[in-house]
Swiss-Prot record:
Residues 234-297, 299-359, 362-421 form the LIM zinc-binding domain. The lineage of its organism: Eukaryota, Metazoa, Chordata, Craniata, Vertebrata. The N-terminal and the C-terminal halves of the protein can associate with each other, thereby hindering interactions with ZYX. It is found in: Cytoplasm; Cell junction, Focal adhesion. This is Testin. Interacts via LIM domain 1 with ZYX. Interacts (via LIM domain 3) with ENAH and VASP. Interacts with ALKBH4, talin, actin, alpha-actinin, GRIP1 and PXN. Interacts (via LIM domain 2) with ACTL7A (via N-terminus). Heterodimer with ACTL7A; the heterodimer interacts with ENAH to form a heterotrimer. The gene is TES. SMART domains: LIM. Keywords: Cell junction, Cytoplasm, LIM domain, Metal-binding, Repeat, Zinc. Pfam families: LIM (PF00412), PET (PF06297). Residues 133-164 are annotated as: Disordered.
Length: 421
């Protein structure tokens, strides 16, 4: 029965979002269909985050699980039905009166997420300091951006072994220990406050690894009291530019209270995207999103996108792969010991390359084998042979010779070019 339940759960996972249109490929994609072990659509090869899949509840469960057993349990609520932790997103609704000719109408703006602060004016200021295309207003480009970053920055398969493909019991245990470690040592959520509000905390408090705050020694507090009044200049830890005292700033507790960021500067140090919902991972003086923090700790399989917990894996083309996942990107045949060609950083077997990706020779109009030498000029290619790379007029072999290109034709001389014009 337990095995049946697992199989059913896996099946439901593959049904999720089935048929959703691709926002990137548009009508070229027949609709989302999850690949069996890759985290992409079987039809268009784009990720789930590129499709119009309704995942609000699923994403709230994912973030809720991330915050489970951490100091951020105030941000989650457990469902009475199954006890699953759910992320309590702070949704902000603003109403603005709009003057009309006869009466006043109300314009309502809903933010799908906002900083969980009591001062709504501060939260509103925070939103206004973000680029407009990244403000999570419901139904906008910014809301779509947030949804995409939730999927990209916080992959469910980076924290939940049940979302991974065929882990061994040993790998499951290692992953659980890894997740427990990063929750206690790196995970954090930014705070939005005015810089002056944090001065007292930076002088009277000290940061304790693990997330707790405690009062510093009274002597230290007395020594720093004068510094509190002297400090009037605030600068962003990221861009080093000055910050206005009345503007909201973001603090990351794990970084310490002496560091602050502009709202638009609170980004991952690797991908430079806004840290979604201000969820960060702190390591060696840098902010990371969940994905890139994990990448700094473990190898990630370029095939299935999962972290590798096995001691045995392969490296090819500056990427890491589970042994069973070093496969052709087109047909999924294993490539160990086989000839392959990299196409857009993805390995493709020789038959699939010739069939789907090979350039066509302008001379014989056949696909050019990846192992065969060729001549390329602009977007045109020829077999580097005496049979194909010839003058389009007199058929003189042009290998090693000067030539005159005209669209898909080549000529050995001005005379030959004139004869064909």
């Amino acid at each position: 029965m337990e095995l049946e339940a697992k199989v059913k759960k896996m099946g439901l996972g593959h049904e999720q979002g089935f048929g959703a249109p691709c926002l990137k490929c548009k009508e070229k994609c027949e609709g989302f269909e999850l690949h069996f072990w890759r985290k992409i659509c079987r039809n268009c090869k784009c990720g789930q985050e590129e499709h119009d899949v309704l995942l609000s509840n699923e994403e709230d469960r994912k973030v809720g699980k991330l915050f489970e057993d951490t100091k951020y349990t105030t941000l989650i609520a457990k469902l009475k039905s199954d006890g699953i932790p759910m992320y309590k997103r702070n949704v902000m609704i603003l109403t603005n009166p709009v003057a009309a000719k006869k009466n006043v109408s109300i314009n309502t703006v809903t933010y799908e997420w906002a900083p969980p602060v009591q001062n709504q004016a501060l939260a509103r200021q925070y939103m206004q300091m973000l680029p407009k295309e990244k403000q999570p207003v419901a139904g906008s480009e910014g809301a779509q951006y947030r949804k995409k970053q939730l999927a990209k920055q916080l992959p469910a398969h980076d924290q939940d072994p049940s979302k991974c493909h065929e882990l061994s019991p040993k790998e499951v245990k290692e992953m659980e220990q890894f997740v427990k470690k990063y929750k206690s040592e790196a995970l954090g959520v930014g705070d939005v406050k005015l810089p002056r509000e944090m001065d007292a905390q930076s002088t009277n408090r000290m940061y304790i690894p693990g997330g707790d705050r405690s009062t510093a020694a009274a002597v230290g507090a007395m020594e720093d009291k004068s510094a509190e009044h002297k400090r009037t200049q605030y600068s962003c830890y990221c861009c080093k530019q000055s910050m206005k005292e009345g503007d909201p700033a973001i603090y990351a507790e794990r970084a310490g209270y002496d560091k602050l960021w502009h709202p638009a500067c609170f980004v991952c140090s690797t991908c430079h995207e806004l840290l979604v919902d201000m969820i960060y991972f702190w390591k060696n003086g840098k902010l990371y999103c969940g994905r890139h923090y994990c990448d700094s700790e473990k190898p990630r399989c370029a095939g299935c996108d999962e972290l590798i917990f096995s001691n045995e894996y392969t490296q090819a083309e500056n990427q890491n792969w589970h042994l069973k996942h070093f496969c052709c990107f087109d047909c999924d045949n294993i490539l160990a010991g086989e000839i392959y060609v990299m196409v857009n950083d993805k390995p493709v077997c020789k038959p699939c390359y010739v069939k789907n990706h090979a350039v066509v020779c302008q001379g014989c109009h056949n696909a050019i084998d990846p192992e065969v030498q060729r001549v390329t000029y602009n977007n045109f290619s020829w077999h580097a042979s005496t049979e194909c790379f010839l003058c389009s007029c007199c058929s003189k072999c042009l290998i090693g010779q000067k030539f005159m290109p005209v669209e898909g034709m080549v000529f050995c001389s001005v005379e030959c070019k004139k004869m064909m014009s």
